[in-house]
Amino acid sequence: MSIDHSRISTQPFPASEKRYLGGSLFPEVRVPVRAITLSPTVEAFSGVTRTLPNPPLLVPDTSGAYTDPAVATDLQRGLPHARPWLARSERTEETARFSALADMDGPLPYPHVLTPRRARSESRGGQGITQMQAARRGEITPEMEFVALRENLRQQEQAELAHQHPGESFGASLPRLYTPEFVRDEVARGRAVIPANVNHPELEPTIIGRNFRVKINANLGTSIVTSSIEEEVEKMVWATRWGADTVMDLSTGRHIHQTREWIVRNSPVPIGTVPIYQALEKVDGKAEELTWEVYRDTLIEQAEQGVDYFTIHAGVRLAHVPLTARRRTGIVSRGGSILAKWCLAHHQENFLYTRFAEICEIMAAYDVTFSLGDGLRPGSIEDANDAAQFAELGTLGELTRVAWDHGVQTMIEGPGHVPMQLIRENMTRQLDVCQEAPFYTLGPLTTDIAPGYDHITSAIGAAQIAWYGTAMLCYVTPKEHLGLPDKQDVRDGVITYKIAAHAADLAKGHPGAQARDNAISKARFEFRWQDQFNLALDPEKARALHDETLPADAAKTAHFCSMCGPAFCSMKLSHDIRAGDVLAGLEAKAREFRELGGEIYVEGSDD
């Protein structure tokens, strides 16, 4: 059996060219960006027409090699390696074999499996391989230069679009220009993470932290009820095409290991998982039969595959479980409920908490990033900001310090369902308790009354909490609470969350954030319809909606749309007013010249 390549989206975006920004410290660094070609501005005045060029606009590109016509992608072999330096690292070594060879068999085994690497025993501790350990040693890694270039997008070359309103960053330290040294310092402090497992060479690195552009994550994965490996690979490529900065594989059905192998080998973005899901499958879905040994082996096998970050619900402690008893919706996190059940069945402390130092050692050996899970997040706005939620947050702050002591990069997961007036408290508490480790939130949803529209109810809260300081937003699709999302749901969720993240970047004053807004506003005022479509987050939808009422080619140069028509277009009227003001001004100056006798030089008065 093989995956149908024709279902994978490889068409470049309209009027767009894949470009690569080269590293100066590390020549092998090639950072992908999308250059949107813009048509020229045409000015007509008093019968004279002049054409002014508009330079291409550079925007972030998470789509990988799939949108590069120069690269022939093959899902059977995986993406080209974007980090070739990994194979030459003297601090890592190849392992003798995989820890989970038996699980590679089945209906769709991956044909080209990489030999896994891990830190050499002598390279652990202070000389370890994680981005945090390197940063603390004062080293700038290729990944650090990569993300610095990715954040900047050569904004200094787009001066015409540089106007930007001052932002309110709520204490964030946004630089005017991102340098590899700034990145190194943020990673060393724990305020940013670069999820980049040494076994994911296909990865194009990204950085997550409140002093950087707000990132978004897309969830996907098989379930016991529906979906397949083929569908999930297709959705991963689809999500990254539309702008997902990371992807989480939340597969809970059969063949979890194989599904993940196909996804990781073909993913240009960091991949996250919740290892407890696969561990539970290994004990036939019986939470009380979970053991540390089963979970440990699952961590290692996923780290060997190249998973970049793990959601680990080590903050769900035995003493916290009774705090959820009076909740309207109890424990809504799958991982949280699994571990709560284990704690109660054994009346013991959560083994992820008691074994946390050992988990850190595994993470450090492969440079896997922690995403400390919020297993007690509120599942309804009635339960928001309650004792259970904040008790777990306190434990996550404690575990963050332990992870940092082991040199492991760490981010913190957050809610959930929170009404607008309670959102800021979540951010201020997290910054304080977790020492500014990056916050990664699911929304939050600001109301519970809109099933089918929860991508909107959550985007409201997502934009707000990202403005306050959340570093990454986990998308919510229209299918939230209703079913497994399909491709269209993934697209809607990603675009909605790109809007929320961008709105937060604007509000914070992220350098260069307003350039795309300025470019599309300029195109709109100049009736450059094709440029408006091409600059949009979803060019296809923008063009399709315009075509519904004005499909003719001539309508793409018209100075009106179907909303106002030719007689009432406000922007056309603004053009007329400006032209009239210019003519009136010229006529006034001509009249003044004649009244002064037509002399080129006029003598000034003696007084």
UniProtKB/Swiss-Prot annotation:
Binding site for [4Fe-4S] cluster: C561, C564, C569
Binding site for Zn(2+): H417, H481
Pathway: Cofactor biosynthesis; thiamine diphosphate biosynthesis
Keywords, alphabetical: 4Fe-4S, Iron, Iron-sulfur, Lyase, Metal-binding, S-adenosyl-L-methionine, Thiamine biosynthesis, Zinc
GO molecular function, one term: carbon-carbon lyase activity
Listed cofactors: [4Fe-4S] cluster
Superkingdom of origin: Bacteria
Cofactor note: Binds 1 [4Fe-4S] cluster per subunit. The cluster is coordinated with 3 cysteines and an exchangeable S-adenosyl-L-methionine.
Stored Pfam families: ThiC-associated, ThiC_Rad_SAM
Catalysed reactions, as listed in the record: 5-amino-1-(5-phospho-beta-D-ribosyl)imidazole + S-adenosyl-L-methionine = 4-amino-2-methyl-5-(phosphooxymethyl)pyrimidine + CO + 5'-deoxyadenosine + formate + L-methionine + 3 H(+)
GO biological process, one term: thiamine biosynthetic process
Entry's EC annotation: 4.1.99.17
Residue positions binding substrate: N219, M248, Y277, H313, S333, R334, G335, D374, G375, L376, R377, E413, Y440
Keyword Metal-binding: yes
InterPro entries recorded: ThiC, ThiC-associated_dom, ThiC/Bza_core_dom, ThiC/BzaA/B
A single GO cellular-component term on record: cytosol
Similarity annotation: Belongs to the ThiC family.
Function: Catalyzes the synthesis of the hydroxymethylpyrimidine phosphate (HMP-P) moiety of thiamine from aminoimidazole ribotide (AIR) in a radical S-adenosyl-L-methionine (SAM)-dependent reaction.
Cited PANTHER family: PHOSPHOMETHYLPYRIMIDINE SYNTHASE, CHLOROPLASTIC, THIAMINE BIOSYNTHESIS PROTEIN THIC
Protein name: Phosphomethylpyrimidine synthase
Native source species: Deinococcus radiodurans (strain ATCC 13939 / DSM 20539 / JCM 16871 / CCUG 27074 / LMG 4051 / NBRC 15346 / NCIMB 9279 / VKM B-1422 / R1)
Gene: thiC
